[in-house]
Amino acid sequence: VRHGVALVAALLTGLLAATPAPAAPRIAIIIDDLGYSRPAGEAVIALPAPVTCAVIPETPHGRRLGRQAAEAGKEVMIHLPMATLDARALDPGALHEGMSEAQIGAVLDRAQTLLPEARGLNNHMGSALTAEAAPMTRLMDQLRRRHLFFVDSRTNAATLAERSAHRAGLPAGRRDVFLDNRRDLAHINEQFNQLLRLARRRGHAIAIGHPYPETLDYLRQVLPLMEQAGVEVVPVSRLLAPPAASVGAAPRPPGAALTSNP
């Protein structure tokens, strides 16, 4: 605990010493993989900031947590399982290679029935599917009809998902930083600092984390410090580029690297 307090104190000192940005930098934090554990999901919902809750639909507690998150004023996303390069087993309700647009639509119908509060979608795993043009085009066409936004988790550096979303006319964005691909406090602190550096440099940045005890303990300590540090925490939908802004845009530099989240 002392080590954690020292890290947070050092973080705050660094933030306050930084040159103020012309406008408050904005960060969004998506917490993925909600639905397996009710206590972990409720701990995410209780975090002292508008984090975005990404819920896997076909999980034991997904439906309840989606409702609770919306009631608490948290933004809800569908965290949809998608095919991976290593062909690992997927949760029910996943998107697989070779699905027709009608089949993809049926998966989304079920997901929206379970999570009617969801305003958008991001990929759970998906290192194979997000790199294929045809299924991404089919998916984004379906999301457009449903007025859902899309965030690319970037589990494959060759992903086509964000570009496909913009071509389909969706508000879309991408993950810049994974907070907790290593579950230790020092690494999470390092990644959070990277998030803040990106936000200060370009005005905004998006992070993805998970409902791990280490991540939640860290966020409970650091999120209340953001206002004093001049950083605004917002739902991810507020950071998404409109379609015309990013078609053909160059990739963002930092934060786009592949990590161990297939």
Predicted ranges, named:
Residues 15-24:
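Bacterial Sec-dependent signal peptides at the C-terminal "C-region" and cleavage site
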Residues 6-16:
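Bacterial N-terminal signal peptides
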Residues 100-193, 200, 204, 210-227, ...:
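Catalytic domains of cell-wall/extracellular-matrix polysaccharide-remodeling enzymes
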Residues 31-33, 53-57, 78-82, 123-125, ...:
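A cross-domain feature marking catalytic cores of carbohydrate-active enzymes
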Residues 1-4:
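Positively charged n-region of N-terminal signal peptides that target proteins for export
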Residues 231-262:
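C-terminal accessory extensions appended to soluble enzyme cores
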Residues 23-89:
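Active-site beta->alpha N-cap acidic-glycine motif
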Residues 69-117:
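Substrate-binding cleft of extracellular glycoside hydrolase catalytic domains
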